[in-house]
């Protein structure tokens, strides 16, 4: 009898209900790349980060302002479609610790990424193209990156080189830390700068190849012409001298 009373009066927002969501949200945040958005940290209604999270008796989480606006016209949960009222919502401020931490990680990542792009712009338009700039070199293959990918920590690799390396090492990077190909995303901004670098480098190489050949050809032509002219002049002189002697 006591067991039934306990179940009947059990608070739907008990600690186990919230703690489960917190554990799963923290795990997803830790495994998510800063360029992605963890679903458990966003509101299913407005798709934005949770700023004023509330939790329903079934364990669904929303931004308070968004769910209240929803309930003005619909008296049901957007996901389960079961009856729901404003009184059923429970504040969930504990989740903000995870949300704010991930947002901070995203901000720091974007700053690092922007610095990389700025450095790449400078490197792509350098005056000399004798050596490949370090920012365009893959730390694994030591060659020019073809398809750049970036980790959550801002480390850049060539996609194919990294994929082959991780297969060989059992998903460990060159320092021995765990890393899988799913932990990286394509770095399109850097790819665009590599294209610019390749364009200028190719143009510079063609320029250096054409100029010596044109110069050498002109020099060879001039030398032959001068030699022929001098030789012809000498022959003419000898003939004239011979005629006069005769």
Swiss-Prot record:
One Gene Ontology term of the biological-process aspect is: positive regulation of proteolysis
Question: Residue ranges of the U-box domain?
Answer: 36-109, 131-204
| Expression triggers | Induced upon infection.
Return the EC number: 2.3.2.27
Cellular component terms, GO, for this chain's entry? cytoplasm; extracellular region; host cell
Which cysteines share a disulfide bond? none
Its EC top class is: transferase
* Gene3D superfamilies assigned: Zinc/RING finger domain, C3HC4 (zinc finger)
Please tell me where this protein is predominantly located. Answer: secreted
UniProtKB keywords? Repeat, Secreted, Transferase, Ubl conjugation, Ubl conjugation pathway, Virulence
Recorded GO terms, molecular function? protein-folding chaperone binding; ubiquitin protein ligase activity; ubiquitin-protein transferase activity
Q: Does the UniProt entry include the keyword Secreted?
A: yes
Copy the domain comment: U-box 1 is critical to the ubiquitin ligase activity, and U-box 2 mediates interaction with host CLK1.
Q: What does this protein do?
A: Effector proteins function to alter host cell physiology and promote bacterial survival in host tissues. This protein is an E3 ubiquitin ligase that interferes with host's ubiquitination pathway. Acts in conjunction with host E2 ubiquitin-conjugating enzymes UBE2D1 (UBCH5A) or UBE2D3 (UBCH5C), and mediates polyubiquitination of host kinase CLK1.
Subunit and interaction comment = Interacts with host CLK1.
Know the name of this protein? Answer: E3 ubiquitin-protein ligase LubX
Name of encoding gene:
lubX
């Amino acid at each position: 009898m006591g067991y039934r009373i306990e179940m009947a009066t059990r608070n739907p927002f008990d600690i186990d209900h919230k703690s489960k969501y917190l554990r799963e949200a923290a795990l997803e945040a830790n495994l998510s790349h800063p360029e992605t958005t963890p679903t458990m940290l966003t509101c299913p209604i407005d798709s934005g980060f949770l700023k004023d999270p509330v939790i329903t008796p079934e364990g669904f989480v929303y931004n308070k302002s968004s769910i209240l606006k929803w309930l003005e016209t619909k008296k049901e949960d957007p996901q389960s479609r079961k009856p729901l009222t404003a009184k059923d919502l429970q504040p969930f401020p504990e989740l903000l610790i995870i949300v704010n931490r991930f947002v901070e990680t995203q901000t720091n990542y974007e700053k690092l990424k922007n610095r990389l792009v700025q450095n790449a712009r400078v490197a792509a338009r350098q005056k000399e193209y004798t050596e490949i700039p370090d920012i365009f070199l893959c730390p694994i293959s030591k060659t020019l990156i073809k398809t750049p990918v970036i980790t959550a920590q801002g480390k850049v690799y060539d996609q194919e080189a990294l994929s082959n390396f991780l297969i060989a090492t059992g998903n460990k990077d060159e320092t021995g830390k765990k890393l899988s190909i799913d932990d990286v995303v394509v770095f399109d901004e850097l790819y665009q700068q590599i294209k610019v670098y390749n364009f200028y480098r190719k143009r510079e190489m063609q320029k250096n190849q054409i100029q010596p050949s044109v110069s050498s050809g002109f020099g060879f032509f001039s030398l032959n012409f001068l030699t022929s002219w001098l030789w012809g002049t000498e022959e003419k002189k000898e003939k004239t001298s011979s005629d006069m002697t005769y």
